[in-house]
Amino acid sequence: MERISQVIISAICGIITADFGSGFVHWAADTWGSIELPIIGKNFLRPFREHHIDPTSITRHDWIETNGDNFMITLPILGKLTWIFFSYSKTEIQAEYPFCAYLFLCSIFVAVTNQIHKWSHTYFGLPIWVQVMQNYHIILPRKHHRIHHVAPHET
């Protein structure tokens, strides 16, 4: 309990890192490289670029198609955290806990970044709790994100 402030700060930093990282990756995929590049172009860059042709296409994807790739990216980190919690002593876990909180929240928010993005393109039928979080800018609001898809800001 004495390190709760460290854990809270670490958790918030994990969320901010995920938010910044996802924005940076989106910007980089929109800006650099060619969709003709082997593997990366077809599997990574093309979906980002096609999203700007049909921004609402993401709303027609199921949960796995929307979030699966991002969840897969986080598995090594979540696996490492699981290993720490099952193999470290209580003292070692307590020493590592703020960093573990950072990694966990960063991983979870990386995993759901496409879901949050999908909600920013969904105009009907969102749960009230999602709308509240959008209205208070806790997650990406629809009106704010729309600017990204309209010239001259389109990237």
Descriptions of predicted regions:
Residues 2-8, 96-99:
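Membrane-interface helix-boundary signature
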